[in-house]
Regions:
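A near-ubiquitous, low-amplitude feature marking generic local secondary-structure context
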Residues: 3, 61-68, 156, 160-163
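Acidic, Ser/Thr/Gly/Pro-rich intrinsically disordered interaction regions
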Residues: 104-211
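Surface/interface-facing alpha-helical segments and adjacent flexible terminal/loop regions used
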Residues: 2-50
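Short, contiguous, well-structured surface segments enriched in hydrophobic/aromatic residues
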Residues: 34-38, 42-101
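Anionic, Ser/Thr-rich low-complexity intrinsically disordered regions
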Residues: 8-16, 24-28, 73-76, 90-97, ...
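Short, charged/polar micro-motifs that form catalytic or ligand-binding hotspots
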Residues: 10, 22, 64-80, 102-111, ...
Length: 211
């Protein structure tokens, strides 16, 4: 019985590693983690194979092509990737736990990213009762992911005050998510992470799709 359980666990480990690594045996089955990562890269304008920033001038590109919807979708795609990784390895608060362990940024800034994720997911916008967000196309010398607002927003105050705006440096954010993906993959490969997924059937049903 113990041997069978160990074999099933090994099968799950191998299948999950393949799902993360895009090494699925069946060419008609796609990993949704890989799909959402490639889609997010495309919509943001990052290199499809590496995720490296192409250094587009985001604001100019968006205004010229009226592509706010695509740009927001790309950012949301990166948040979805964090959600997916969190759901595989954490039973509760998946995205918060992923950011807590792997982001390397302060807790307050982690909560800001969760707030932006919720804004985009629920309203497809950049404000809620806690935050007003500004998306910044950072230059190569900027290392921050989040710049906190100068003044804490009064809950429910939707007035357009400059001091209320919290800035998200988009290129640094996408680089952060790419880095988190690689760190989680490495930790899992080295048996430092255990999935909360129960079996291969659940993994395939939730995190792969057929063409």
């Amino acid at each position: 019985m113990a041997k069978i359980k160990m074999e099933k666990q090994k099968d799950l480990q191998n299948e999950l590693l393949n799902t993360i690594s895009e090494l699925l045996d069946d060419s008609n089955i796609n990993s949704v983690l890989i799909l959402v990562r490639k889609t997010a890269r495309f919509l943001i304008g990052n290199n499809l194979n590496t995720g490296e920033n192409k250094r587009l001038n985001i604001n100019e590109f968006i205004f010229e092509n009226n592509l706010y919807h695509s740009f927001f979708s790309g950012i949301m795609g990166y948040f979805t990737l964090l959600d997916q990784l969190g759901c595989i390895f954490y039973a509760k608060q998946p995205i918060r736990n992923v950011l807590k362990k792997y982001s390397g940024i302060p807790k307050k800034e982690q909560e800001v990213l969760v707030g932006l994720r919720n804004c985009l997911a629920h309203n497809y916008g950049l404000a809620n009762k806690y935050y007003n967000f500004s998306l910044v196309d950072n230059n190569e010398n900027e290392r921050r992911v989040v710049e906190l607002a100068k003044t804490k927003k009064i809950q429910g105050d939707y007035s357009n005050k400059d001091d209320y705006y919290t800035s998200i440096y988009i290129h640094n954010f996408t680089s952060l998510v790419e880095d988190i993906f690689h760190k989680i993959k490495e930790d899992f490969s080295n048996n430092k992470l255990k999935p909360v997924i129960k079996n291969v059937s659940e993994l395939r049903a939730r995190f792969t799709i057929k063409q």
